[in-house]
Design a protein with these regions (language model features):
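Subset-of-secretome marker
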Residues: 1-164
Length: 164
């Protein structure tokens, strides 16, 4: 049975975990809200000082660069920690539709996330943002009476150039 679960896992990874370097241009507020940076929210960040492990501000000539670093957090939710600034995975999102397969005991461990944001000195506007947040996904896969604990790592990297 582990071979069947392995095959399903590989299929799911091939389907959902892809490198996508295509640039997209978002112009409407609705399009931007669906993608940047926490899809479906009408806010960009709800970070508090307690959510951030470290912060650095650098003068980059015509821009200021702010780098925020994050520690380790398990199952972020309620718009705190990683969920205050990143589109995090939850159990209802990681649920593949395969006949006879069910997933339980999902655990999402985020670690060493970073946000790098650059702001124009002239306007104060955000001109670029880079989001990088690794996660270890652990879950139990149930298939035809077999239970297999699965662990996989992935990193989400998003780059946004902002034009006004």
């Amino acid at each position: 049975m582990p071979k069947a679960i392995d095959a399903i896992g590989k299929s799911a990874m091939k389907t959902f975990m892809k490198r996508d370097d295509k640039a997209i241009v978002l112009t409407s507020k609705e399009d931007i809200r669906n993608v940047f940076p926490v899809g479906g929210k009408d806010w960009v960040s709800k970070l508090t000082p307690a959510d951030v492990k470290g912060a650095k501000v650098e003068d980059k000539g015509g821009e200021y660069q702010i780098t925020l670093t994050f520690g380790t957090e398990v199952n972020p939710s309620d718009e705190k920690g990683y969920a205050a600034a990143f589109g995090v995975l939850t159990a209802d999102v990681v649920n593949f539709d395969y006949p006879g397969l069910s997933l339980t005991d999902q655990k999402f461990t985020y670690y060493n996330g970073t946000i790098v944001a650059r702001f124009s000195k002239t306007t104060g506007n955000l001109v670029y943002a880079h989001y990088d947040y690794p996660v270890i996904i652990e879950l139990t896969a149930h298939l035809l009476g077999s239970n297999t604990r699965v662990k996989v790592g992935m990193t989400t990297i998003n780059d946004f150039s902002v034009k006004y």
